[in-house]
Each structure stands twice: as structure tokens, then as C-alpha cells.
């Protein structure tokens, strides 16, 4: 059985300073969600809008180990039950990547980038380095209410940022 961890971020391990700087630059300062960062180019400026969001979501899924079951964008009222259904409400493992977050006023891909940005900006993350890779575990909340949780490989986060800037490769 795989080791399980609590969703606790007090005194959680952080990545080395080089990786932390990259994460901060790519997902906080350069967050592509419109209106979130004055420094970034939003999705539409990068060429991702309309139907191309579906292509982006598909490309992101192919650049990760996420499946429909483990990349869930759910109503607020369904968040806790979805986390329970996946067996990650109280604890998580590093067996698979997962992203479960509440729908807000953003599309699925925007919501994911917004969740990652918020977890990094507010310190609700934990870094793991194992034989199978490096992982970033994240959680977001608003007014004390859980809004999302994710376990994502660092390599996946790097590939996602790369594909954002290479839309011509995916939109033919």
C-alpha cells in the first residue's frame, strides 16, 4: 500500500529556491487567467479562446496522467463528495495525479490555473521528491471553505506552461 499524507501545509516542505522561483514566475506572476496578474498575457492573448480551450484541455490531459475521473471541475456542493469518492478527502497518495476543484466563474482550464496560482500565492502547497518524480500538492479555500485540491507532477506543470506558449503545435 502506498504511503498516505494529510492535507496539511503547516511547515510543509518547499521546492529548492530555483524551482520555487520558476513556479512563482510561471503560475503566480504569469498566471494566464484574465485580470489576475498585471504582468501576464491572458489565455486569449496567447491564442487560446473559444473552441481552442477544448484543444488546450485535451493537450493538458495528454501531457499529464490526468483522466476524466481525476480531473474534476465540480459544483461547490459536490466538491467534498467527489474528494471522498476518489478517496482523497482526508489523505492523499502520490500514486496518481489529480485535480478536483469547484466551478466558479471561470472555464475549466482557467479554473485550474487559478487554483494553482492561489495555492502557490497563499502557501497552501507541499513539495514531494520521490523515486517516481517530484510532486506539488496543493489546496485552495475561500473564507475557510475548501475550493480545490490537486496532486500534480512538477514535470506536468512544466509541460503545461510550455504548451501554453506553443499553441501552433496543437492548433492545426
Language model: regions and residue ranges:
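Amphipathic alpha-helical interface elements
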Residues: 1-133, 138-172
Amino acid at each position: 500500500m502506498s504511503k498516505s499524507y494529510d492535507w496539511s501545509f503547516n511547515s510543509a516542505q518547499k521546492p529548492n529556491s530555483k524551482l520555487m522561483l520558476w513556479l512563482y514566475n510561471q503560475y503566480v506572476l504569469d498566471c494566464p487567467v484574465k485580470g489576475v496578474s498585471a504582468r501576464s498575457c491572458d489565455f486569449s492573448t496567447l491564442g487560446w479562446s473559444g473552441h481552442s480551450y477544448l484543444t488546450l484541455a485535451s493537450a493538458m490531459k495528454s501531457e499529464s496522467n490526468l483522466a476524466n475521473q481525476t480531473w474534476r471541475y465540480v459544483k461547490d456542493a459536490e466538491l467534498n463528495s467527489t474528494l471522498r469518492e476518489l478517496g482523497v478527502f482526508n489523505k492523499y497518495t502520490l500514486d496518481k495525479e489529480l485535480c478536483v476543484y469547484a466551478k466558479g466563474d471561470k472555464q475549466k482550464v482557467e479554473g485550474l490555473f487559478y487554483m494553482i496560482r492561489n495555492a502557490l500565492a497563499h502557501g497552501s502547497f507541499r513539495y514531494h521528491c520521490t523515486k517516481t518524480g517530484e510532486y506539488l500538492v496543493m489546496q485552495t479555500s475561500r473564507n475557510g471553505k475548501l475550493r480545490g485540491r490537486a496532486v500534480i507532477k512538477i514535470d506536468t506543470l512544466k509541460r503545461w506552461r510550455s504548451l501554453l506558449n506553443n499553441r501552433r503545435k496543437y492548433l492545426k
